Amino acid sequence: GNVTPNLARSWETPDKGKTWIFNLGQDIFWQDGEKLTSDSINYQFSDVEVDKPDEHTIVFKLQEQFSVFPSIVSRPTFKKGLLGTGEWKVTNISLGQAEFVQKLILVNTKKDKQIYKFYPTEEQAKLAFKLGEVDEIQGIYNIKPFDIWSTVTITEEVNKNRVVVIFLNTQDKLLSDKSFRQALTYAIDKNSGGQRAISPISPNSWAYNPTVKTYDQDLERAREFIDELPNELKENLSINLVTTPVLLSLAEKISKEWESAGIETHVQVSSSIPYEFQTFLAIFDIPTDPDQYAIWHSTQTSTNISKYQNPRIDKLLEDGRVELDLEERRKIYLDFQRFLIEDSPAIFLYHPVTYTVIRN
């Protein structure tokens, strides 16, 4: 999606994306009654110079051109005490171990109260609902056992801002071979989850490319790619698939499909991104802006999950984050998706369905 005005009514860049000037609204107040001014907004950027020439203007001076910057500063803004500018005010916050937020209490101007509780896993949230600790749970992926309860109302939504994806370790001896990566991709039935995904960019985005290669399931094609592998790779063809607990059943299904193509598969469960892996099945949060430099650029060693290195992709990502013209940016990201999908450093499966369960 596009960045839209909120606290800032308008913004501009006089030098092609190196300096960004934001003009704040003049009729906005914090929840304590204080007027919102440039001095009451603080961003902690280590490599950005911030000037506030008057109470309605903030100027950010970057070290390099960066067309994505408006989306970076579009996150929710609070002042000290978790005070915002909206209808609902945080009146209490409870923290657990490692500063994990356990509970928020919010009150609006009519004195209505909402209590939000947070759980580290989906299973713990579902248990809390069963025990009557909460009356509504949001954003769960596995609706069981509530689908057979008569005392609840269930709604579902396809979350197009997330994608279920298998990251392939392109530095692995076996997975460095493009033909093998494509064999894995062709072997999977990708229509058994939510809405079919073909790209790391959301279909809601202005940069989405609907014409990329789709890799519909084709076991015969997968076996052909495997037959073409060098003999030393075909010997004892075996692979590990790591996944998170919520996707375990999907991982087991994929394991059977890979084995049908002649690839012995071992499934492991991990609660975090493993440092060493061959294939990793996870749910990926798609950034609002199509810039995915952190995920696919070869220099991003801590966030490039597939350990992917491709000079053409690097150049497209570099160009996309400095280009200001929207149509030119769109062309760049259309090419980015086309070449990335062709090279198969990851397998995009579907946009997941999430459920909300409300006690009647």
Short names for language-model regions:
Residues 2, 55, 61-116, 122-124:
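Gly/Pro-rich hinge or "lid" segments in bacterial periplasmic/extracellular proteins
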